Amino acid sequence: MAIRIKSTRVGRFVSESVGLGHPDKICDQIADSILDQCLLQSKTSHVACEVFASKNLILIGGEISTSGYVDVVQTAWRILRNLGYNETDFSFLSCINNQSLEINQAVLKNNEINAGDQGITVGYAVNETKQLMPLGVLLAHSFLKQAEKLTKQFDFLKNDMKSQVVLNYSLNQVECEEVLLSIQHTNAISLTELRKVIENNVILPVLNQYGFQDKKPTCLVNPGGSFVLGGPMADTGLTGRKIIVDTYGPYAHHGGGSFSGKDPSKVDRTGAYFARFIAKHIVSLGWASECEVSISWVFSKPNPQSITVKCFNTNIQYDEVLINRVVNNYFNWSITKIIDKLKLLDFVKYSDYAVYGHFGNDLSPWEQPTELDKLECLIKNFH
């Protein structure tokens, strides 16, 4: 059964997500936990942490300048123990350096935070869900969140897992055509029984939650067969390799920079959060039903180089040129102001965002459109 939806999309869109125990996400969680520990001790910490996991080895590297002290290995073990690993499973190598003095001097000038690098960041919003996120992205995450709950109920389920969802859009309605789940398990359950458990306890409940109740999609559970060996033992992991999972799936562009392990002076993270903040304002105001915001940055400069808004012909009340004028006039914020406004050094525990996406959680400061009245007033003056 297709459900009604506010959307002008036509055709198939495929979204994916990965779980807590996926090797790339293990690395992201470790990197963000190290970042959290640094910022907890000193808000002026500069962190660019990378993690590599393969077989029984975990390598933690990068540049960290902080007045505090963080035991990166013990921080990593807190993540790994939560996933069921013990001290005999991994050895560690650590190669942490201070941030380059040249970069540090360029980033901090006159108590102002400047862009830690050049780059392009992208934000997106669409009114097809109440979170103003693409439906397929939310579905892909929801299947794995539900499966994660089951790992606490059934010992035969493990944390390395992936999802993939095929949605077919047409004429303001959407059908879920196919759901693919690959979930690590033990030898204590047969593949046939595993498929029944996942279909009945994960796929169908989530589909019902989203209104897909009458027509069951094609369900593929572990289509490759058994999946006993998982995590870094089966597949090498690296920070920053799931940037599309972290954002908007196939629905929007991406600037290319990853988020995990990076403090707010890094525009890859802060710029992407800011772009989402702007896009959500535009859709919340009804200026467009779909919006993509691209922001470019110049190394050592405090303000955006450019902000470009695309509405994909979904803007009715105001011309896209006018929307761009208003956005560039109002949101030409410095990085210091962005960090303050989005509470990036006060509110955020970054490891909470290392899995299941950085956008769509209404509690996140960048998800709260606080400037609606000011923008509405400004566009009327420009109009």
Swiss-Prot record:
Keywords: ATP-binding, Cytoplasm, Magnesium, Metal-binding, Nucleotide-binding, One-carbon metabolism, Potassium, Transferase. Pathway: Amino-acid biosynthesis; S-adenosyl-L-methionine biosynthesis; S-adenosyl-L-methionine from L-methionine: step 1/1. Its cofactor is Mg(2+); K(+). K(+) binds at residue 50. InterPro entries: ADOMET_SYNTHASE_CS, S-AdoMet_synt_C, S-AdoMet_synt_central, S-AdoMet_synt_N, S-AdoMet_synthetase, S-AdoMet_synthetase_sfam. Its main location: cytoplasm. ATP binds at residues 22, 160-162, 235, 241-242, 258, 262. It comes from the Bacteria. L-methionine binds at residues 63, 99, 235, 266. Mg(2+) binds at residue 24. Residues 99-109 are annotated as: Flexible loop. Binds 2 divalent ions per subunit. Binds 1 potassium ion per subunit. It catalyses: L-methionine + ATP + H2O = S-adenosyl-L-methionine + phosphate + diphosphate. One of its GO terms (cellular component) is cytosol. Belongs to the AdoMet synthase family. This is S-adenosylmethionine synthase. It comes from Mycoplasma genitalium (strain ATCC 33530 / DSM 19775 / NCTC 10195 / G37) (Mycoplasmoides genitalium).
